[in-house]
Amino acid sequence: MRPMTIDIDELAFALDTPGIDHYLDLYSGKVLLISAEAPDPELDALLENEPERLLLIDPLSTTQSLGLMQDFLREVEEPHAYATLANALQSRKPFKAFKHSLMEYPELLQDWYRYQNERLREWALDWLEDNDIQPAARQSPTSLLPPPGKPFA
């Protein structure tokens, strides 16, 4: 595995954004967006001249995204909220209905965002591993501080 500094949150966002092409730049570790509305000549040239440098980030499938909501539902303890969300997932438009139903439960909505973010980050790390890429270790803010009794340089 090759270590690379990557913004895991950007990668998670790319995995959760169907219909828009995202690539991982294998040299810089940056997640790049290719937009049909605002073409980027530099990115287009990179795709044409150095395609091996860019790795397409396939977004989660509809089944995976729906599974994420179903997994979250198992965490819901309040019976009325559970029933409302379960019905939403059985509707014709489960994504829209699920998110609309969550609006009725502000605390649960926050729980959903936390749960979704955690799971997307896990999927991002799995995606990196599947592609033989190791995220470089990040230093915690406290590890950047000098030892006690030593002044900042």
Curated annotation (Swiss-Prot):
It holds the Pfam family UPF0158. InterPro entries: UPF0158. Belongs to the UPF0158 family. This is UPF0158 protein PA5073. It comes from Pseudomonas aeruginosa (strain ATCC 15692 / DSM 22644 / CIP 104116 / JCM 14847 / LMG 12228 / 1C / PRS 101 / PAO1). The lineage of its organism: Bacteria, Pseudomonadati, Pseudomonadota, Gammaproteobacteria, Pseudomonadales.
